[in-house]
C-alpha cells in the first residue's frame, strides 16, 4: 500500500538528529511513500523554524535532494477541505485533511500521531 507521509515522519527521515530518525528509517524500508504540497510545505515550515533554523533555500535543497534520491511519489492536494470526514477539532484540521486526501487516493496517511483516530491514518510503530 502507498503511504502519504505526514510532516513529522518526513522531517524525521531527513534529520539524523531528530528524536525519531532511526524509527523512521527502519519503518521506511520497503514502503512506497508519497508526498503532497501540504507535506512539502510543512517540511519547509518546520525546517526554517526555530527548531532547525535553516535558510529557506537550504530547506528547499534538503527536500529537493530527498525527492531526487528517494523518488517518492507525488499526489496533488486535489480535495476540498470540506470533503471527507470533518476534523474533531481545529488543531487536527490539517491532519484530518491529509488523512482524507490519502483516503481519497486509496492510501493511508503515515504518521507518528497516535491521537489521530481517522480510518485512513496509520501510526508508524
What positions do the PLM features span?
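A conserved hydrophobic position in a structured secondary element of the catalytic/binding core
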Residues: 5, 35-38, 77, 111-112
